[in-house]
Swiss-Prot record:
Top-level EC class: ligase
Task of the protein: Cell wall formation. Catalyzes the addition of glutamate to the nucleotide precursor UDP-N-acetylmuramoyl-L-alanine (UMA).
Lineage of producing organism: Bacteria, Bacillati, Cyanobacteriota, Cyanophyceae, Synechococcales
Catalytic activity: UDP-N-acetyl-alpha-D-muramoyl-L-alanine + D-glutamate + ATP = UDP-N-acetyl-alpha-D-muramoyl-L-alanyl-D-glutamate + ADP + phosphate + H(+)
InterPro entries: Mur-like_cat_sf, Mur_ligase_C_dom_sf, Mur_ligase_cen, MurD
Recorded name of the encoding gene: murD
Molecular function GO labels: ATP binding; UDP-N-acetylmuramoylalanine-D-glutamate ligase activity
Domain of life of the native organism: Bacteria
SUPFAM superfamilies: MurCD N-terminal domain, MurD-like peptide ligases, catalytic domain, MurD-like peptide ligases, peptide-binding domain
Keyword Protein transport belongs to the record: no
Pfam families in the cross-refs: Mur_ligase_M, MurD-like_N
Protein name per its UniProtKB record: UDP-N-acetylmuramoylalanine--D-glutamate ligase
Organism: Prochlorococcus marinus subsp. pastoris (strain CCMP1986 / NIES-2087 / MED4)
Amino acid sequence: MPIKNNSKKEGKINFVIGLGRSGFWAAKYLRSIGKRVIVWESKENKELLERKKILEKLDISVCLNKQFLFDEFYKFLRQIESIVVSPAIPFDHKTIIKLKERGIVVIGEINIAWESLKNINWIGITGTNGKTTVTHLLSHILRENNLFAPFAGNIGTPLCEIAYSTKSKNIDWIVAELSSFQIEIATHCIKPKIGIWTTFTPDHLDRHKTLDNYFKIKNSLLKQSEFRIYNYDDQYLKENFKSLLNGIWITTNPNVSDSDHCDYWINNENFIVERREKLLSLKNFKLKGNHNTQNLLLAVAAARKIGLSTERIKNALLSYEQLPHRMETIFQRDELEIINDSKATNFDSSVAGINAIKGSPIIISGGRLKNGDSIEWVKIINKKAKAVFLFGESSQTLKKLILEGGFKNDILTFNDLSEVINYAYSYIKNNQSETLLFSPSCSSFDQFRDYEQRGDIFKKLIYEKFNIKFIAH
């Protein structure tokens, strides 16, 4: 249900649950259109206190250390216009269920943004892995061609921040990265002009319970999209080729049997082909790995649908700089390269990164283990790794998996990243090594705020050891 200015609802309360980035901007936007807003946040820290001060100056009530319990809402039930919940709160949370049973509107930040921005062309990008790179790359291609195409959503800029901006009326395209958490609460609300599905592998099953539920949530975005782009290289999407709604398919496989189903592929000369016509060479594409070639094809297919010429796309790609923490080379000297792939938060993304490395890398992995199939990860470790250094909550579990797979090279466990880097520095000096790859294959939440903080700390530790100036992103 949309939130609109309505004199009959004057004085009604819009609760915002969670004071993360999306909650902060949802509250600011709602207040800017004349709504009464109360924000509840279960934690308290310096950053939250600063946000609280900013919102209170806008006449928004903010309560920290406030738990999301139904009893807390009871006295407000007749006054509530809507409750905007953080994507981190499961939609089957008992408080949400009780509120909905009483007819209370429970929505997400994206629902609010959509109501404001629905007359603008949206590109909705989802997938287990690759969605951030595709979002960033496609936005870059469009912006380099004089289209106002900001990226937003799960990539870090809340969509309500875009809605709040006075520049929003001038936007040509919104390039939105949408996670399953965001899609789940906004099902049947968002209707993108173009929907892109990058990959699908088991993830977030602690939240979505079953793989089928996870698939349906992702697919709901594509069903709502006017035009769809899929990745035929993804095994699960490929297996569901016939059941998915019609759309454009891409593949990096030059074999005719595969490309018969696809509109974009890579030929044996390393050219992107569009329906049998050569478009552009991959020679100058900077990103490592076959998974990034898939990301490129998805972005190119969308850019072509929007109407950009091959030459315009090619010129935009020449100036593209990759996002940090994604196969990011942070050190290269003599024969040693050190790569930060902190964004590899599950086994599948880790496999993609390891596959992109030539030779036998030293691999650093660890963190909080997610649900997912480790078979291919163990295989690639056995096939390629010169040594494996494990840290954090999952270190012993990962060690057991690797040893059960028959790994014969060095494998060591550590408490944290600092210990790993201290040892790795000495190990590299005493053993000829070409590549040190930070590929966690796990979430960061055992020791870090997010994968970005984890990646920045990894870089800081490396730079301290190698005496290089560190610049955090």
